[in-house]
Amino acid sequence: MAKRLEIYKCLKCGNVVEVIAGGAGELVCCGEPMKLMDEKNKEGAGEKHVPVVETKDNGVLIKVGSVPHPMDADHWIQFIEVIRKDGKVGRKDLNPGDKPEAFFIMKPEDILSVREFCNKHGLWSK
């Protein structure tokens, strides 16, 4: 059963999906069940992956890692996402060459969680 806001990845083709509305069915791609991505927050290369939240005058700036994450053609952050306490979600999709950061107009106290998805190392959260 897929739940709202879970992230799944196809291990064959690399498709990544986020569940908008949960349901009882199994997510399948390329003829195989998709892998549920666990949220990491400490292990391995955390200094380049765990989101860092900075408060700004009219919102929050989310940077990926205390050390900037590479944004190369073969290794980059695909998106940065903020999940608010009221259930709303903000997301910025990124491409190779972009800065690994996103600005959201919101109050820091409204943040429930922040996460990002690295094409090589998966889903990371704070």
Ranges and model annotations:
Residues 23-33:
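Cysteine-rich micro-motifs
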Residues 17, 33-34, 122:
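Cys/His-rich microdomains that often coordinate metals
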Residues 63-64, 100-107:
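Exposed aromatic-hydrophobic patches
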Residues 64-72:
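Short amphipathic, basic-aromatic surface patches that mediate peripheral association
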Residues 1-12:
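Intrinsically disordered, low-complexity linker/tail regions enriched in polar/charged residues
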Residues 10-13, 29, 118:
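Short cysteine-rich clusters marking metal-coordination/redox-active sites
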Residues 7, 16, 26, 115:
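Residues immediately within or flanking Cys/His clusters that coordinate Zn2+
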Residues 119-126:
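Short acidic/polar inter-strand loop motif in beta-rich domains
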